Amino acid sequence: MPHSVLARLPPGSVRLVAAFGLLLLVSLLVLHRRPGRPHVAAAAASDRLTDPSRSRLFLSQSPGANASIAADLRALTAGPHLAGTPASAGAAAHVLARLRAAGLQTLTREYEPLLSYPGHASLALLRPDGSLLARLSLEEPADEGRRVVPPYHAYAPSGGAVAEAVFVNLGREEDYVVLERLGVGVRGRVAVARRGGGYRGGVVARAADKGAVAVLIAGNADGGVERGVVLLGGPGDPLTPGWAATSGAERLKFDDKAVKQRFPSIPSMPVSAKTAAAIIRSLGGPAIPAEWKDGLGVDTGGLGPGPTLVNFTYQEDRKFYKIRDIFGIIKGQEEPDRYVILGNHRDAWTYGAVDPNSGTAALLDIARRLGIMLQSGWKPRRSIILCSWDGEEFGMIGSTEWVEDNLEDLHSKAVAYLNVDCAVQGVGFFAGSTPQLDKLLVDITRQVRDPDVTGKMVHDTWNEMSGGIKIERLARTDSDFAPFLHHAGIPSVDLYYGEEFPGYHTALDTYNWMEKHGDPFFLRHLAITEIWGLLALRLANDPVLPFDYQAYTSQLQEHIKTLSALTSNGHAVNLMNGCVNDLSGAAMEVLKEMKKLQQMDLYDEHARMRRRLLNDRLLLAERSFLQPEGLQGRGWFKHLLYSPPEDYESKLSFFPGIADAISRSANLSDKEQEVAMQHEVWKVCRAIQRAASVLRGEFSEQKPTNFSSLVTP
């Protein structure tokens, strides 16, 4: 692989890259790639195994692989390995050694971001006169050996409070509406919330907006206390937004407006269910609504405020630490400058058996299998990069810094990013993807045996469990696909077994739990490994990329239907339907072109050039959905279809700019809301039209479409 994939490159225009890339490709192919034996030989080497043969060879290595996966997971989870600690460096060494043992070329990239660790913390209940009533534990009952980092919220500011407490349920807007109706306010008080109200940083931010002076978030009643990050405004190092946090890089000051917006304004802390219950039992005020008691384990107490006081102090320790991303690389034989990227993070809040090292063990088994295939003489058509990220638990830092470090290279060369974080956390297969990868994903699950039902394939049980195949869209920011999709516009997939895990981010996330409860025979690990690896093989080897933009248009049409139910702005809906129809036409044309090329001689030079150009259009179309300046007020997020909305409680999980406009204008008249939405609607429409033009391989100005009639009252 060219070293440039890991080189630092200056940021630039997405559209300029796309146009320049296409022109450069045409020039290189026409001027330099004349028919000749070397090119035929390279193509023959990469295509020596047909797709069924490649799949069979990959799957033939499954017997006994579950034992290998289990051994890697046991080694990785022998102790806690939080990013920035010596133990984390040990986990990195294990991954590096296993990639090298598989015969892959390896690279390591270091970054030096700002990380946050806990210092001193204390919590006590006081009587109304200020005398001590009880000291409350901030430790985790499940952590008997006291080996893991104490529960804390990364990047929560140092501070303290002596104030009355209020129970705010999940800390959502609707919960504060209930409190207001009951005459309970949180201004100047400590908000006590229970887990389940969405992103913890959003829960803290909403409490601060309501005037709270501190927030305590209760864990589940099983003894675990959920650690986590509370930064706002997107992933990555908070002091280097948009560029890599390399040693000696420019760093913004803490008083910079962009930095201050990312850090919470009040201290917060995760606490055990037992500690939260002790506080709630001491509260008076209105009775707790019955539906708010779920999982609390309290039968007395009220919503507050008071009469007892909470005395809470917290001291944060912020430092710059080195983190290490590790890469295993297989250089493509025919198209080495096209990258199929598989990623999983390596760092963990505690032992990490589920999050993330179930995925790490699967990644290492893929490396082992690909190494055996290389020894057999196989080489992929395109390059395959296996990525082991560091610093994910602090806000996807390792992956984000690498994407920012290599943005131009990725814009022009990345085919897709395939993510696995918590590979196995329970029963049932779940997946998210950008829509053009849906069909490929579904097809792959027809090739993999279901780990829980004998005689069935994953596709069968997935379909039965969900009442039809359901694929999530990746607008959330809780794993490493976020920088690839939301910032770089790279088609992405996320895979996992099990919807929820009670030990998430707690000391319960151990190898022992996995062996006893999560996946005793490691067969779900095996299924994820096979799906993940087969996806990579198809994307790295199919002569024509298996992208289906008809599925994208169908999904956009569904999104528009959902939007139309939330707004009375019929003009906006009509406008968007017109743009999607244009994309649908382009997708149909591409589908016909794909079928023609699939019938042509694989080694014909003219056909090879046409395939290359078509593939470039297919991979660049997703970049068309990027807005170079980003979303309003949130410039790091650039994807106009699938970035997270500003309001984490928004009813829209797509069209984030439109979702933000709706949220910001919620208290305005219908006419004012329409005006607020209109500009964001046009942005989305222009992006969809750009994608249609890219798919057709033409300048957008060549076929201007008149949509004025659609928006004329």
Curated annotation (Swiss-Prot):
| Chain residues that bind Zn(2+) 2 | 355, 393, 505
Where are the catalytic residues? Answer: 392 (nucleophile)
- Name of the featured protein: Probable glutamate carboxypeptidase VP8
The annotated region (Catalytic) lies at 245-539
The family this protein is said to belong to: Belongs to the peptidase M28 family. M28B subfamily.
Residues annotated as glycosylated: 66, 311, 667, 706
Which residue spans belong to the Cytoplasmic compartment? 1-10
- Per the UniProt record, the source organism is Zea mays
> Which gene produces this protein?
VP8
